[in-house]
Amino acid sequence: MKYDIVLFDLDGTLLNTLEDLADSVNYVMMQMGYPVHPLESIRQFVGNGIRILMVKATPQGEENPRFEEAFAMFKAYYLTHNQIETRPYDGVMELLHDYEEQDMPMAIVTNKNQESVDVLVRDVFKNHVRVAVGDDGIRPRKPAAAPVEEALRRLRQVYADRSWARMGVEDALSEEDWLEWIKPHVLYVGDSDVDAATAENSGVDCALCAWGFREESLLETLPHVVLLHKPLELEAFVRG
């Protein structure tokens, strides 16, 4: 195997969430009397978490005196409307099923708020993915390395019997040293410039997927080890 661990972005990588995000944004815009946004504008707004999404969507952003009201309205509405049109991309469920059958360590690392992540992992993926790190409002968001490193720490606990998880236990290797040791064995899969920067900042390899929210022409300019056009292409690449 070329990699021991696979990490996935969520929106635009595993799930097509664009329409539900757009509908939720525009619900808030209409409720507050602001202009609505076309789907393609929302596509460009996503990637840095829902607060940044709403900063970009709300006139004057955080300078708007009603911004916090708009943001709270979005969070409440989206939490109960995040599975209307949201679907896994073709081939994603088969890929996750195959990896689960192989007991392949995998995790989700996303800027989506943790509450929504937990709901989607439970309802869409039926908890096939055992570790999912979202935005908890405390830890730095992607493209910082912190979410990736948190996912790796949790995977080490979940897969404590693996040789790579046990590495350093006997000789008291520090957690920081273990993270640096494991990173060459990790692949991060995403669909955007944020994901490429996350992988680079985290010191792990990046696979980019062309079926997501960004144009392939942009993806080709970003640092990556492979550009995927179908989810199942990932299996062959990871196997080497």
Locations of regions flagged by a protein language model:
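Active-site neighborhood of HAD-like aspartate-dependent phosphohydrolases
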Residues: M1-Q44
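A metal-dependent, Asp-based hydrolase signature
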Residues: N48-T80, D90, H97-D98
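Acidic, Mg2+-coordinating phosphoryl-transfer loop and its flanking beta/alpha structural elements
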Residues: Y188-L227
